[in-house]
Structure formats: structure tokens, C-alpha cells
Amino acid sequence: MTDLHDVAGTALMSRPLASILINNYNYARFLDKAIDSALSQNYPTKEIIVVDDGSTDNSREIISRYGDRIIPILKENGGQASAFNAGVARCQGDILCFLDSDDFFHPDKLERVAAAFHQQGMNSRAMLVHHFLAIKSHMDNDLDGDTFGKTHDSPMNLYAFARRYRFLWNEIGPTTSISINRRLADRLFPISERARISADAFIACGASLVGEAYFLKEILGGYRVHGNNNWHGAEQRISQNYSDALQEYLNRKLVENNLAPVISFDDSIYAWPRLVSDRRWSKLAWHMLRLSALQHDRYTARFVYYTLMSIAQLGMKTVKSRTHHLGVMADRFHRW
């Protein structure tokens, strides 16, 4: 296992260009703080690209104030994936760092991420690096000192898991924690523009299949919880269209990288949140029993057990309560 915690002593003989890609839609009240955090990086070789996805507030007025310190891309509204694609197509960096416009970077973010990539060989292979984020309120107050992130052993590649179970968990944190090298960007982009929100999952899951993911055990940015976040809790809002788009994209990328297209969400335990949300209890029970019979392993059996136990405990609660509680149980099971 590779430990990325101690990268402080990693000397950068050169500092490759890092591209900060800020995607924005109607977040004018936070946008200047995101841009300022990018400009304040203590890493000298950087470019800052701000993609405005057809905002109807005063976002573009704010963008214009920064002049040639940033590279603006002003486009019609097409959703988060289209904003990602526009930014990646324009950027020149060997390191690509994504930043949601309602979040911000700490000043040493680029330096630390660049050191992590350098430690692993920069563009020697397709890599993603992610890290913890401090959770903030819309007023920039700490929320009980909590952090946001998903930890795992490094390097992580989930293709063997996906080949067996026909799906994969998203083991990567939200957009603002994600950085990728150019080699991985060339494999993943463009991503499917059917994903108008939560497009970061396409990057995260794609990297977990056709690249390697590394977790850096440091807090290098802030994630704001303000009630309108697209990522926060998005895993509990999996629509059929979204899962179909993600499945098609992942299988296409697998084929492009000479791997078998093994993803089939509806034939896996990935389908359970939607079945719960739609209150399709009989289909959920049949689905879980069928998977348990097909897989014959403790992993699937445990998931079935915790899912059915959770449903039994929910009683007459609302669908919203059902989905949230099952999400907690699934997370506990998954990390067990």
C-alpha cells in the first residue's frame, strides 16, 4: 500500500502546469471566494479556467472583474458534465484540479497535490488524487469540525470488483477534492453530457476502473453545505436515466481501454436505492434474493441482510426517511 500522507518532503524538481477548473451555475454569492482561493495558491505555475454554465444571476459580472487573471468560458446551460468537458478541452495543464464554485481551496492545495503526483511518477500512468475537505456552512463557519472525504487503500483500482459484482461503489470524494493527471484526463474525457448534476461520479468511477486512485490524508479545501448542493446526498437520488448514462459511459471507457464492459447496474446491488425510493418492495426482495443465489458469497449475503433488516425497521416512515436510513446502513455495511 502506498502512503500519501507524508509528501511534505517530496521535492519538486520542476512544477508542471496545474489547471484549476471552476464550474459555476448561479453561485454568484460564492464565486468570488472560489476564484480568490485559486488565485491565492502558493504554487506558481497554474492557470485558472472558470466555466459559467449559462448562469442567470450576476456570475458573469463577477467573472469579468478578474480580467486576464483567469480564463473565462461563457456557455449556454448544458449541465455540470458539459461544463467539465468545456474546461478540460480548453486547459493545458499536466494536473487538472476541479473546483465547484460554492467551495474553495486551501492555499497549499496545488503544492500538495502536485507533490503527490510527483511521488507516483506524474504522468507515468493514469492517476487520480483526492483528499479531505472541511465542511463549512454558507457563512464559512465550521460545522462541528467535520470533514468530508472517502478513505481507501492506495493505489485503488476496482475493475476486479466490478467484473465480479457488475457494479462499483463511488469511493472518491466530491468534485472539489478531485485532481487527475493528463494521462487519465485523456482516457476519461469527454464524459457523457446526460449527467446534468453529480457528474463528478463519472470521473471518480471512470478513474477507479481505467486508472488508479490515491487518497491524500490532508484537508486541502472547504465544502459548503447550504441546502442546494448537488453532490451532498446525491447518491440517494439515483434515477434510471442517470444510472443508464453512467453505465453506458463506463462500459464505453472500458472497451476503449481494452477491458471487458462488465457494468450492469440493474443486475447488481447498485439498483437497491432506486427500488427503495420507488417503494418497489416485492421487486427489491426478489432482486436481492436472486443476487444472493447467483453470487454465493458473504459480501452479497451481508448486503441483503442489512438491506432487509433496514426495511423492516422503517415501518411507516416516509420514503425520504427510508432512503436516508438505508444509505446509513449501506455505508456501515460497505465499510465493514
Give residue spans per PLM region.
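Nucleotide-sugar donor-binding/catalytic module of glycosyltransferases
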Residues: 2-238, 330
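C-terminal subregions of glycosyltransferases and related glycan-biosynthesis enzymes
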Residues: 3-8, 165-169, 197, 209, ...
